Amino acid sequence: RNDQAKREEWKVTLDTENRDRSYLFGRLLAVLEQAEAATYGKEDRRETNALRRLTRYTQQPMHTARALYEKLNPYLNRLMRNKPGLYRQYRALFDQLFGLLDELEHTSLNEPLEDVYLLGYSSQRSALFTKQEQNETNTDGGNTDE
C-alpha cells in the first residue's frame, strides 16, 4: 500500500478536473468555511460552523454538508447585501461542487472521507484566498481614484 501511495501524485494547486469524492468534499468544506468567514469583521476571530463540525464532516460528509449549508443562509444573505460579487462567486462554487457530487454514486456520499479531502480543502482554500486578494487589490486601486 505504501508503494501505491508513493506512486500516486496529487497536485497541490486546485485541480478542477479531480472527481475523487473525498477531494470534492474537501473543496466543498473550504467553500462552506470561507463563505461564512467572508462575513466576519477583521476583529472577529470565532471559529466557523464548518471547522466546529470538522470531525463529523469527515465521518458523514453529505449529512453534515447539508446541515452546514442550511446554517449558511444568514451569512449568504449578508454577502448578497454587502459583497454581491463574492456572493455570486460562492454560489457558483456551490452549484459546481454539488453538481459534481450529484454525478457520483449516491450511496457513497455519506461514507467517511479518505485523507485526500485535505488536499481538496487546502487547494480550494488557497484558490479562494488568491482570488479574494486579487479582488481586494483591484477594489483598493479603484477606491483611491475616486
Where are each of the predicted segments found?
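Intrinsic-disorder/low-complexity detector
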Residues: 1-146
